[in-house]
């Protein structure tokens, strides 16, 4: 009976994590379509899309090592969307120098991905556990660095007492996403899944709190 309850809980959490995460991956689609329509990236930051490709690639690699079909499915979809975003963002950068700089960032991400995979597989021919630990740790570090990027924006919000630019729907979805993957990781007893997502949940909660404390204002 207890096993059945745990299995039902796992199925429910898998569904929630999958649905919410894919929804988050789809959300930038509207922005990218506007960029394509205007043939200009405007003030949209493109690094987020490169980071998303790198993050998805690393977790796909981790999912393959651990035979985690849920993570494999979600991050494969996320990677496809993210590559689409990166390509169309780069294609619509009007300045030659900015376009080259963006390509350099893409190349750096590729080198970083290859380096992480190489470190994870180095001298671990018959040692799957070490390979999993290395890749899980390094993927978590990259994940945590991504989550830390909104901290600068939060500091600006606190100083200006204005949360303009923070979207409440995204913050809510991010919180739910972090919580669902945290529970998923805890059920699997996988520290490399639940630890970075605990941090993601905390940061999303802080964002929601800031939006509540400092409602968005249009500054003239």
Curated annotation (Swiss-Prot):
It holds the Pfam family MtN3_slv. The chain crosses the membrane at residues 9-29, 44-64, 70-90, 106-126, 138-158, 167-187, 191-211. Its main location: Golgi. One of its GO terms (cellular component) is membrane. Residues 12-92, 134-217 form the MtN3/slv domain. GO terms for molecular function: sugar transmembrane transporter activity. One of its GO terms (biological process) is carbohydrate transport. The keyword Aminoacyl-tRNA synthetase does not apply. It is a multi-pass membrane protein. Keywords: Cell membrane, Golgi apparatus, Membrane, Repeat, Sugar transport, Transmembrane, Transmembrane helix, Transport. It is found in: Golgi apparatus membrane; Cell membrane. Belongs to the SWEET sugar transporter family. PANTHER family: RAG1-ACTIVATING PROTEIN 1, SUGAR TRANSPORTER SWEET1. Mediates both low-affinity uptake and efflux of sugar across the membrane. This is Sugar transporter SWEET1. It comes from Dictyostelium discoideum.
């Amino acid at each position: 009976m207890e096993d059945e309850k745990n299995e039902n809980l796992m199925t429910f959490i898998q569904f929630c994590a999958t649905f919410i995460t894919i929804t988050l991956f789809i959300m930038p689609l509207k922005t990218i379509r506007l960029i394509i329509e205007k043939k200009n990236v405007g003030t949209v930051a493109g690094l987020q899309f490169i980071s998303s490709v790198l993050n998805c690639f690393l977790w796909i690699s981790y999912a393959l090592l651990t035979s985690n079909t849920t993570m494999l499915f979600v991050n494969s979809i996320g990677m496809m969307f993210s590559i689409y975003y990166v390509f169309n963002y780069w294609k619509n950068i009007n300045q030659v120098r900015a376009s080259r700089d963006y390509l350099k960032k893409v190349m750096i991400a590729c080198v970083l991905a290859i380096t992480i995979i190489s470190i994870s597989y180095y001298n671990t021919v018959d040692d799957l556990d070490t390979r999993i630990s290395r890749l899980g740790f390094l993927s978590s570090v990259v994940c945590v660095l991504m989550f830390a990027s909104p901290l600068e924006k939060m500091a600006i919000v606190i100083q200006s007492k204005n949360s303009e630019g923070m979207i409440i729907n995204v913050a809510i979805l991010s919180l739910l996403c972090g919580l669902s993957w945290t529970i998923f990781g805890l059920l699997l007893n996988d520290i490399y899944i639940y630890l970075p997502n605990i941090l993601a949940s905390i940061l999303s909660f802080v964002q929601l709190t800031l939006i509540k404390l400092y409602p968005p204002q249009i500054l003239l």
